[in-house]
Amino acid sequence: MKMRVHLLAVSVLLVVLALQTTPAEADINSEMATCACQLIYRPVCASNNESYSNECVLKCASETPTGRSIGLHKVKDGNCNGEF
């Protein structure tokens, strides 16, 4: 029973995250298939005003063709919150 509830919660979270993906982020995410980052939530704000779950994920995104073309880099620790 607990496993079903947990699985349902994870499924709902994945659907919500998929619906919030922007076109530029979708390009970067589709290029990041080979990255292996730990599932640690320590958000960082990037130069594209997107929050990444941790520095490893941001580094991975910055090394994609799209990330390199836009000069993706860390701006600050924490979520972006639409600050710029």
From Swiss-Prot:
GO terms for molecular function: peptidase inhibitor activity; serine-type endopeptidase inhibitor activity; toxin activity. The keyword Glycoprotein applies. GO terms for cellular component: extracellular region. Keywords: Blood coagulation cascade inhibiting toxin, Disulfide bond, Glycoprotein, Hemostasis impairing toxin, Platelet aggregation inhibiting toxin, Protease inhibitor, Secreted, Serine protease inhibitor, Signal, Toxin. One of its GO terms (biological process) is suppression of blood coagulation in another organism. Residues 29-82 form the Kazal-like domain. The record marks L39, I40 as: Reactive bond. Transmembrane segments: none annotated. It is found in: Secreted. Glycans are attached at N49. Disulfide bonds join C35-C60, C37-C56, C45-C80. Coiled coil: none annotated. SMART domains: KAZAL (SM00280). Induction: (Microbial infection) Up-regulated in salivary gland following infection with Plasmodium falciparum. InterPro entries: Kazal_dom, Kazal_dom_sf, Serpin. Interacts with human ELANE. Functions as a slow and tight inhibitor of host neutrophil elastase (ELANE). Inhibits host proteinase 3 (PRTN3) and chymotrypsin. Does not inhibit other host proteases involved in coagulation or inflammation, such as cathepsin G (CTSG), trypsin, chymase, matriptase, beta-tryptase, kallikrein, urokinase-type plasminogen activator (PLAU), coagulation factors Xa (F10), XIa (F11), XIIa (F12), plasmin (PLG), thrombin (F2) and tissue-type plasminogen activator (PLAT). Inhibits host neutrophil chemotaxis induced by N-formylmethionine-leucyl-phenylalanine (fMLP) in vitro. This is Agaphelin. It comes from Anopheles gambiae (African malaria mosquito).
